[in-house]
Design a protein with these regions (language model features):
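A well-ordered secondary-structure block
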Residues: 36, 146-210
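Metal-dependent phosphoesterases centered on the DNase I-like endonuclease/exonuclease/phosphatase
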Residues: 222-223, 227-324
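N-terminal, active-site-proximal structural segment of metallo-dependent hydrolase catalytic domains
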Residues: 2-162, 354-355
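Solvent-exposed loop/turn segments at secondary-structure junctions
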Residues: 65-66, 115-118, 144-148, 173-174, ...
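Conserved beta strand-loop-helix elements of the APE1-like EEP
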Residues: 132-135, 160-176, 204, 311-327, ...
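Active-site beta-strand/loop signature of hydrolases that rely on acidic residues for catalysis
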Residues: 57-63, 92-123, 168, 201-203, ...
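Short proline/glycine-enriched turn/loop segments at secondary-structure junctions
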Residues: 188-190, 306-311, 335-339
Length: 355
């Protein structure tokens, strides 16, 4: 009996030490970006020149790391699956790449949830693949998720992940920055969550001002209104600061909230609508700024089950905001029926006034 107790105590001690060692390792290797970081621009060698054209096309798309296509549900959204098969993930990525490669008329592409290396996407370097596809373009990648091991769900842990956001431009980028959002959780939870951010890219214009494009991916799964307000102020203060200098400002991406007063069109392209838990406050930006979205089709679907059109609740979380010195010509959701991502792309056409 005494021997059994000693063995049991040794096992318990080993488990405790293993757990402490794991937490210590994750803490030591935790990704800790600065509030503002200068980012490297990838692309062909070229001198930065003044942007002459005043009419521009942009597209934003959360590609769901090529892991959340129509066949998938997701454990974190009350589904059961953690990752697709390697074959399925490759199919999603091929289709996503094909779509992006076909956007010849689009000047700027803002992607969210794109992996450099992660178990959830079978270690495919999605950033490199997209960059090679768009080899005549300029791009900036910023990490917002880097963890050595995510231990959930316990029956099939997500494991290693290194992913983030990618801004792609047809024009040379004069400067690029990563701006960190505040952490939404305390230790130890923060060790396993995204380090949210937005990417700022700058382009000089012929009139002496800059076009400033912000690629954002705001927090999900946050019910504390004060945390969301704090996060939103980071980007809106930057937007207002740039506009006060006479610059042209475009912010787009996955805001994880409905735009102010959003109501879907009657048909909604055959989709079932749900109102998101979080609604963007109309007063979060000054009067004169434009919320650029499309109410004819959704950009996001719920992942508690595989996608069936008309059954899964859908909504819009992806859109643009443009400054008062920009005319919005068109905003359109490109309805891909969530075949390769749990988000649809949003496209806008704009015109810079007095450039």
């Amino acid at each position: 009996m005494k021997k059994f107790i000693l063995v049991l105590l040794k096992i318990i001690l080993i488990l405790i030490l293993t757990f402490i060692g794991f937490v210590a390792y994750i803490t030591i290797t935790d990704y800790r970006p600065d509030d503002i970081e200068i980012m490297e621009v990838s692309g062909p060698q070229a001198e930065v020149f003044e942007l002459q054209q005043d009419t521009l096309n942009l597209l934003a798309w959360n590609i769901g790391y090529a892991g959340l296509g129509a066949e998938m549900d997701f454990f974190y959204d009350k589904g059961k699956q953690v990752r697709p098969t390697k074959k399925m993930s490759r199919k999603y990525l091929n289709n996503i790449s094909k779509f992006i490669g076909e956007q010849d008329s689009v000047d700027f592409i803002l992607l969210q949830e794109i992996d450099e290396k992660a178990r959830r996407s079978h270690h495919a370097n999605e950033v490199q693949e997209i960059r090679e596809l768009m080899n005549n373009s300029y791009s900036v990648f910023a990490k917002n998720y880097h963890c050595q091991f995510i231990p959930v769900p316990v029956y099939e842990p997500m494991g290693y992940v290194r992913g983030g956001m990618l801004t792609i431009s047809d024009f040379p980028i004069s400067k690029a920055e990563r701006h960190a959002y505040p952490l939404i959780a305390s230790w130890p939870n923060k060790l396993f969550l995204l380090d949210r951010c937005f990417i700022l890219t700058r382009f000089p214009l012929a009139n002496g001002k800059d076009l400033v494009i912000l690629n954002t991916h705001n927090s999900a799964y946050v019910t504390d209104k004060n945390l969301r307000i704090k996060e939103l102020k980071i980007i809106t203060n930057k937007m207002k600061e740039e506009f006060s200098k006479g610059n042209y400002v475009v912010a787009g991406g996955d805001w994880n909230a409905n735009p102010p007063g959003y109501e879907p069109a009657d048909n909604y392209n055959g989709h079932k609508f749900f109102k998101s838990e979080v609604q963007m406050d109309l007063n979060s930006i000054p009067e004169g700024w434009i919320w650029a979205y499309d109410n004819k089709a959704p950009t996001n679907r719920q992942n508690y089950k595989s996608f069936v059109k008309g059954e899964n609740p859908t909504t819009i979380l992806d859109y643009f905001v443009v400054s008062p010195n920009i005319e919005l010509i068109k905003a359109e959701v490109i309805d891909l029926n969530f075949q390769d991502s749990d988000h649809n792309p949003i496209y806008v056409k704009i015109r810079l006034r007095n450039n």
